[in-house]
């Protein structure tokens, strides 16, 4: 007896009618925005060699990847991320292209999620990558595109900005191994503040251990910068990063975000390749981030094509659900008379 011929694999589902229309609507709105901003579409293979994602700071656990082998026995994976394939593509196909390079995509990714996590193993992402550009102007360009993309789907979003560099500078002052720093980062990301306190209390007390303890609470509006200043005295990297974030916050405030723009120094993205500003967007009544991005200036060095870069990925499925929940998609059911 066939046990699985009437169901889809765990973490996947059929998409019908209004959901199809909603997903198509989100994809069309976002890709239109990207094209109008001068970005060119690229499509990478659904399968990549495992080596593309086996970089030291790729931060995608191998157990989250769907794997197979090709006809020569080489290990391949179903694409779990889009930034790394685009970094590979840029390094191998676009090196001679004038910089900066503006690329966009709208493709599914595949992740082997934990059981009962409630997340889909197949998710469509739409996003952009600005490669070969650094500095404030480039960061504003990409984050402004993210804001426009979100606004095309809902007004009920909140954009949080943080800095991977700020956490990295604090962590570098701790007398611990790289693996321990990653444990601390993961603990902050998971918001397990009790475990974070235990980890840091086991270390010699310093201004830096106290700063990391308080990172998750450095969240809010412009007042957060004054709170963070106490940890930056005498530390050039922290001071420079704080000044940059203050300047970026001021520039982004002009986009009309009002109280939807927040500073979050506890925002430590999972992807270890981020080196500067990081940002996430959340929508009311939707638990997970619907958009995530940041600056990753060292990633392309792993493909022998060093250049600065920044980008973001929007969760098309999540934004489509938001459109449906907001009642912004009309019924598309068609009825025909029996012949």
PLM segments and residue spans:
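TRNA-binding/sensing appendages of the translation machinery
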Residues: 1-84, 92, 140
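Phosphate/dinucleotide-binding and metal-coordinating scaffold of catalytic cores
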Residues: 2, 98-99
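Positively charged, Gly/Ser-enriched RNA/tRNA-binding surfaces
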Residues: 19-20, 25-37, 48-49, 83-96, ...
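Beta-rich nucleic-acid/ligand-interaction surfaces
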Residues: 47-62, 162-169, 267-276
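Acidic, His- and aromatic-enriched active-site or binding-groove loops in soluble protein domains
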Residues: 64-70, 176-195, 283
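Internal, well-ordered alpha/beta segment that forms a basic, Gly-enriched binding/recognition surface
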Residues: 138, 159-162, 171, 188
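Extended alpha-helical scaffolds
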Residues: 153-156, 164-171, 180
């Amino acid at each position: 007896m066939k046990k699985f011929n009437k169901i889809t694999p765990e973490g996947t589902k059929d998409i019908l009618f209004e959901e199809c229309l909603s997903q198509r609507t989100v994809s069309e709105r976002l890709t239109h925005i990207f094209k109008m901003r001068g970005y060119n579409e690229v499509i990478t293979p659904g399968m990549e060699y495992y080596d593309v994602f086996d970089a030291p700071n790729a931060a995608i656990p191998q157990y989250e990847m769907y794997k197979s082998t090709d006809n020569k026995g080489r290990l391949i994976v179903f694409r779990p991320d889009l930034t790394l394939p685009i970094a590979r593509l840029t390094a191998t196909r676009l090196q001679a292209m004038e910089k900066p390079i503006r690329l966009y995509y709208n493709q599914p990714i595949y992740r082997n999620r934990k059981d009962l996590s409630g997340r889909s193993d197949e998710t469509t992402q739409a996003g952009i990558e600005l490669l070969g550009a650094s500095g404030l102007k480039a960061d504003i360009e990409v984050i402004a595109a993210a804001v426009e993309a979100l606004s095309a789907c809902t007004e009920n979003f909140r954009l949080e900005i943080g800095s991977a560099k700020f956490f990295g500078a604090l962590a570098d002052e701790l007398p611990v191994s790289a693996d321990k720093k990653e444990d601390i980062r993961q603990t902050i990301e998971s918001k397990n503040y009790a475990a974070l306190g235990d980890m840091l209390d086991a270390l010699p007390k310093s201004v830096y251990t106290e700063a990391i303890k308080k990172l998750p609470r450095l969240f809010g509006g412009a007042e957060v910068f004054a709170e963070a200043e106490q940890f930056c005295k005498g530390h050039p990297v922290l001071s420079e990063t704080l000044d940059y974030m203050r300047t970026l916050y001021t520039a982004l405030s002009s986009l009309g975000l009002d109280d939807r723009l927040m500073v979050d120094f506890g925002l430590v993205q999972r992807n270890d390749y981020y080196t500067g500003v990081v940002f996430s967007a959340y929508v009311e009544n939707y638990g997970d981030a619907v958009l995530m991005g940041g600056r990753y200036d060292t990633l392309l060095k792993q493909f022998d094509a060093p250049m600065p870069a920044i980008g973001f990925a929007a969760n098309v499925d999540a934004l489509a659900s938001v459109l449906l929940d907001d009642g912004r998609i009309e019924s598309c059911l068609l009825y025909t008379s029996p012949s």
